[in-house]
């Protein structure tokens, strides 16, 4: 979940682009991501075949490449999409604040997609995942409410250095989310085939 945040901080700095994520954005993202992950994954029911799985070896490291690879691939893919989206917006004449707003909104919603993509149970469709774990829908509603509140209230919007996206910005957010969902679904399908 943190890979896109790291990339969106480092890459603009290294390439001398306008800043995409300010400290206040990172604080808000941490306040959203950590509780969301804890609540959703802790409330997730155990997999149906959990007791049929062989136990993990005592010598197996939780930091083995096999365990980290999926998260790295997912996060780097989302980060690349957001960086390309930012570059496209800049080329289309969007202001740095407008580009930042689109990237921030898409990042927050992409984190929700990452949570959905990594659920252990009923991963074939969002509706099934929501029915198996009602906390996912609640987290989505709460996160969307926070985003709307930030964009609707000028003091919060100014604090976050964001702006309400125009038509081009909304289209960009929608396209980035669709591409992120395609990427995450593809990674999940490839991993399922490899593990089969």
Task: List where the protein language model places each region.
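Alpha-helical transmembrane segments
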Residues: 112-116, 179-189
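Membrane-interface helix termini and inter-helical loops of multi-pass transporters
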Residues: 89-95, 124-126, 155-163
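Membrane-interface segments at loop-to-transmembrane junctions
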Residues: 25-27, 51-71, 124-141, 160-168, ...
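Hydrophobic, well-ordered secondary-structure elements that form the walls
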Residues: 76, 112, 145, 154, ...
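Small-residue-rich transmembrane alpha-helices that serve as helix-helix interface/gating elements
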Residues: 104-107, 164-181
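Hydrophobic alpha-helical transmembrane segments in multi-pass integral membrane proteins
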Residues: 81-85, 142-158
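Membrane-interface capping segments at transmembrane-helix boundaries
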Residues: 119-123, 185-196
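Membrane-embedded transport module
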Residues: 1-122
């Amino acid at each position: 979940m943190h890979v896109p945040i790291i990339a969106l901080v480092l890459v603009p700095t290294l390439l001398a682009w306008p800043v995409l994520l300010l400290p206040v954005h990172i604080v808000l993202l941490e306040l959203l991501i950590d509780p969301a992950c804890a609540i959703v994954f802790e409330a997730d029911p155990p997999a149906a075949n959990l007791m049929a799985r062989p136990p993990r070896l005592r010598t197996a490291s939780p930091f083995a490449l096999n365990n980290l690879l999926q998260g790295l691939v997912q996060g780097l893919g989302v980060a690349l999409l957001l960086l390309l989206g930012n570059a496209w917006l800049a080329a289309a004449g969007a202001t740095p604040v407008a580009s930042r707003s689109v990237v921030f909104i898409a990042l927050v919603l992409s984190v929700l997609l990452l949570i959905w993509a990594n659920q252990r149970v009923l991963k074939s469709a969002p509706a099934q995942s929501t029915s198996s774990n009602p906390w996912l829908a609640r987290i989505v509603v709460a996160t969307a409410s926070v985003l709307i509140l930030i964009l609707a209230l000028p003091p919060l919007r100014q604090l976050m250095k964001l702006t309400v996206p125009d038509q081009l910005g909304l289209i960009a957010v929608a396209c980035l989310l669709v591409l992120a969902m395609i990427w995450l679904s593809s990674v999940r399908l490839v991993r399922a085939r490899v593990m089969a």
